[in-house]
């Protein structure tokens, strides 16, 4: 079974300009690498905790705007995109962006924030044998527009952002140029990030992220069966349900929050945390989402033999406008006429008018010969004295983690897998 996800974030700005961002991340230079070797004040674990705080705040706002619907987004990519934008911001606009990302500016300098992102994104982009994580960014600049060299150099040095020239006076051609780039970088999963462009567009900043991995213990397609999934108060829907028996995997039963937590590991440095609230307890679990809750779940996980594990096979996509959501998190000025993005163009005539986030999440069997027979599926009969069945036949949460950095590239809520 492969787990595939791709996301795009578009920030469009108007005045004489449009800024665009899809989900993504970027790289760094030798100077940043040297700082990494000597250590940095903002280490990856601290950044992961801050990003988790931002992720859960963003998740709660998305749930309010999209009740009882599927949610898929990349908090890492959104925060990295906003961090790139902050390179061009000044004054209160800059402070709002960084504080909205949950950074305490009295404790962490702007330079440390960018270096921290650079270290993290470089580690994520390092080639891996069994898990594919590809992140990056690109600047599409109006060919008649002068962008400050310092901004371009910072974006390239800290985030390794590629730069391209585009003719936004020909919106259809410019749109094709951008969408073709994103489609290629996300392996065809994000087919149309940009749906329309204004001729007043000045610059488009595209961020993307693509993730693909195989389970350490795969599901057998022959065991998949049709099953009911209870999506809210409506009639149950029929979905393909993957099945596995006698799996030993990290497990925790949270009686306080009335939910079950199961970790399924990938073949490389990644894992997925599945949170299954009891019937009618999803809102309680969602309200409790915070870094401390996640820490409790992770620290409480213990290997447990699950006699039967049933998980839906699904492919879902989401499309969000994030201006209102980000405003709720305190990032407001950048969308107003008071926006100060003068470190991009040298003038204050630029603001962000639109933030569009697109995501695709695909969980499906591959039929490949992944490491299925490692012994973890077989246990003594005595272990079945207290049989345990975990049945994901109602709404649940997924959090994907890079186990080296503890960062969560993706968070999802599966309200209806059909």
UniProtKB/Swiss-Prot annotation:
Residues 367-392 are annotated as: RCL. The record marks 381-382 as: Reactive bond. It is found in: Secreted. Induction: Expression is induced by bacterial lipopolysaccharide (LPS). Its main location: secreted. Glycans are attached at residues 38, 104, 269. Belongs to the serpin family. Residues 1-20 form the signal peptide. Disulfide bonds: none annotated. Expressed at high levels in brain, heart, liver, lung, spleen, testis and thymus, and at low levels in bone marrow, kidney and skeletal muscle. The gene is Serpina3n. It holds the Pfam family Serpin. InterPro entries: Serpin_CS (IPR023795), Serpin_dom (IPR023796), Serpin_fam (IPR000215), Serpin_sf (IPR036186), Serpin_sf_1 (IPR042178), Serpin_sf_2 (IPR042185). This is Serine protease inhibitor A3N. Keywords: Acute phase, Glycoprotein, Protease inhibitor, Secreted, Serine protease inhibitor, Signal. GO terms for biological process: acute-phase response; response to bacterium; response to cytokine; response to peptide hormone. It comes from Mus musculus. Gene3D superfamilies: Alpha-1-antitrypsin, domain 1, Antithrombin, subunit I, domain 2. The keyword Glycoprotein applies.
